[in-house]
Amino acid sequence: MAKHLFTSESVSEGHPDKIADQISDAVLDAILEQDPKARVACETYVKTGMVLVGGEITTSAWVDIEEITRKTVREIGYVHSDMGFDANSCAVLSAIGKQSPDINQGVDRTDPLEQGAGDQGLMFGYATNETEVLMPAPVTYAHRLVQRQAEVRKNGTLPWLRPDAKSQVTFQYDDGKIVGIDAVVLSTQHSEDISLKDLQEAVMEEIIKPVLPTEWLSAGTKYHINPTGRFVIGGPMGDCGLTGRKIIVDTYGGMARHGGGAFSGKDPSKVDRSAAYAARYVAKNIVAAGLADRCEIQVSYAIGVAEPTSIMVETFGTEKIPTEQLTLLVREFFDLRPYGLIQMMDLLQPIYRETAAYGHFGREHFPWEATDKAALLRDAAGLK
């Protein structure tokens, strides 16, 4: 492979689509705290002065959706109408129904191991050894830029920052290896009382320099900081937001394929979410075991059926053992039936609000990021 560029983007927790994701997952967490067996499909729409929460929820729990919504928006940082959105005064509308009994009968089983998939679909998981968290570098550093933006906004270092922001990083590769960063884009919402020059200098010093490794930066690296010149109107006032609209930001930044299903607001019986997490877990353990430098897993399901309809392992020519053997190891060491993967990763717990900003993968404290199967895989493969 010759020299090439690859770009990934991220968005902050204050981006309208991410506000929606976080509200959906905050509702999910509140329900799972009381009722781990709940069926939740919670969608959120945000626009100036309004939040609409809808979907299908079947549960014995009672949660205050309005209060959860306001608390989530408040924690993100929208607390004044000057920002274009105010947690304290926005309207919160709810349109919640129950899960269809036709779906329910295919998912629930007397024997939990026979729990069927909540829908048909295909999911992908990916890992690469180009970063310490076994994630692609472009999306990893795009996330870290907007995480840093939120950090210096909330701790008062740059008090004129506002919650909405986007980042984009272009990496240069030579023969599949990173040789540098070609371009960095960071657009951040701000208050009226900061000049573009002061903003650009502060963002460079307080956000970009602390995050990006100096060995990848050069005199040729291009920086675009608030390139439109002004970003005062942002958040839901600038754009409406919707749950599930940032599926590439949520996953691998375009470096791996995507089955199309979004994550936020869905309980773990929805394989769109849980099987994508499981596929990441499998791929990461294969790479951590040294069985491949890059690994992509595809898994697919039929609604109401427990066993996956297919499992595929792709290693892009980096495998250390035959891919047929890798596929056999995946089937031996990972239970990818819906109930099996829920148990394997302990998914029936309220951990989802935190996943809804800055990427679902590459943050080590989530259970699907564990590499506890790596040694077993390596031994079984016969590698020393």
Curated annotation (Swiss-Prot):
<keyword id="KW-0460">Magnesium</keyword>
<dbReference type="GO" id="GO:0004478">
    <property type="term" value="F:methionine adenosyltransferase activity"/>
</dbReference>
<keyword id="KW-0547">Nucleotide-binding</keyword>
<dbReference type="InterPro" id="IPR022631">
    <property type="entry name" value="ADOMET_SYNTHASE_CS"/>
</dbReference>
<keyword id="KW-0808">Transferase</keyword>
<keyword id="KW-0554">One-carbon metabolism</keyword>
<feature type="binding site" description="in other chain">
    <location>
        <position position="15"/>
    </location>
    <ligand>
        <name>ATP</name>
    </ligand>
</feature>
<dbReference type="GO" id="GO:0006730">
    <property type="term" value="P:one-carbon metabolic process"/>
</dbReference>
<feature type="binding site">
    <location>
        <position position="43"/>
    </location>
    <ligand>
        <name>K(+)</name>
    </ligand>
</feature>
<keyword id="KW-0067">ATP-binding</keyword>
<keyword id="KW-0479">Metal-binding</keyword>
<comment type="similarity">
    <text>Belongs to the AdoMet synthase family.</text>
</comment>
<feature type="binding site" description="in other chain">
    <location>
        <position position="99"/>
    </location>
    <ligand>
        <name>L-methionine</name>
    </ligand>
</feature>
<feature type="binding site">
    <location>
        <position position="239"/>
    </location>
    <ligand>
        <name>ATP</name>
    </ligand>
</feature>
<feature type="binding site" description="in other chain">
    <location>
        <begin position="245"/>
        <end position="246"/>
    </location>
    <ligand>
        <name>ATP</name>
    </ligand>
</feature>
<comment type="subunit">
    <text>Homotetramer; dimer of dimers.</text>
</comment>
<feature type="region of interest" description="Flexible loop">
    <location>
        <begin position="99"/>
        <end position="109"/>
    </location>
</feature>
<comment type="pathway">
    <text>Amino-acid biosynthesis; S-adenosyl-L-methionine biosynthesis; S-adenosyl-L-methionine from L-methionine: step 1/1.</text>
</comment>
<dbReference type="InterPro" id="IPR022629">
    <property type="entry name" value="S-AdoMet_synt_central"/>
</dbReference>
<dbReference type="Pfam" id="PF02773">
    <property type="entry name" value="S-AdoMet_synt_C"/>
</dbReference>
<dbReference type="GO" id="GO:0005524">
    <property type="term" value="F:ATP binding"/>
</dbReference>
<feature type="binding site" description="in other chain">
    <location>
        <begin position="164"/>
        <end position="166"/>
    </location>
    <ligand>
        <name>ATP</name>
    </ligand>
</feature>
<feature type="binding site" description="in other chain">
    <location>
        <position position="270"/>
    </location>
    <ligand>
        <name>L-methionine</name>
    </ligand>
</feature>
<dbReference type="InterPro" id="IPR022628">
    <property type="entry name" value="S-AdoMet_synt_N"/>
</dbReference>
<feature type="binding site">
    <location>
        <position position="239"/>
    </location>
    <ligand>
        <name>L-methionine</name>
    </ligand>
</feature>
<dbReference type="GO" id="GO:0005737">
    <property type="term" value="C:cytoplasm"/>
</dbReference>
<feature type="binding site">
    <location>
        <position position="17"/>
    </location>
    <ligand>
        <name>Mg(2+)</name>
    </ligand>
</feature>
<feature type="binding site" description="in other chain">
    <location>
        <position position="56"/>
    </location>
    <ligand>
        <name>L-methionine</name>
    </ligand>
</feature>
<feature type="binding site">
    <location>
        <position position="266"/>
    </location>
    <ligand>
        <name>ATP</name>
    </ligand>
</feature>
<protein>
    <recommendedName>
        <fullName>S-adenosylmethionine synthase</fullName>
        <ecNumber>2.5.1.6</ecNumber>
    </recommendedName>
</protein>
<dbReference type="GO" id="GO:0006556">
    <property type="term" value="P:S-adenosylmethionine biosynthetic process"/>
</dbReference>
<dbReference type="GO" id="GO:0000287">
    <property type="term" value="F:magnesium ion binding"/>
</dbReference>
<dbReference type="Pfam" id="PF00438">
    <property type="entry name" value="S-AdoMet_synt_N"/>
</dbReference>
<dbReference type="InterPro" id="IPR022636">
    <property type="entry name" value="S-AdoMet_synthetase_sfam"/>
</dbReference>
<comment type="function">
    <text>Catalyzes the formation of S-adenosylmethionine (AdoMet) from methionine and ATP. The overall synthetic reaction is composed of two sequential steps, AdoMet formation and the subsequent tripolyphosphate hydrolysis which occurs prior to release of AdoMet from the enzyme.</text>
</comment>
<feature type="binding site" description="in other chain">
    <location>
        <begin position="230"/>
        <end position="231"/>
    </location>
    <ligand>
        <name>ATP</name>
    </ligand>
</feature>
<dbReference type="InterPro" id="IPR002133">
    <property type="entry name" value="S-AdoMet_synthetase"/>
</dbReference>
<dbReference type="InterPro" id="IPR022630">
    <property type="entry name" value="S-AdoMet_synt_C"/>
</dbReference>
<keyword id="KW-0630">Potassium</keyword>
<keyword id="KW-0963">Cytoplasm</keyword>
<dbReference type="Pfam" id="PF02772">
    <property type="entry name" value="S-AdoMet_synt_M"/>
</dbReference>
<feature type="binding site">
    <location>
        <position position="262"/>
    </location>
    <ligand>
        <name>ATP</name>
    </ligand>
</feature>
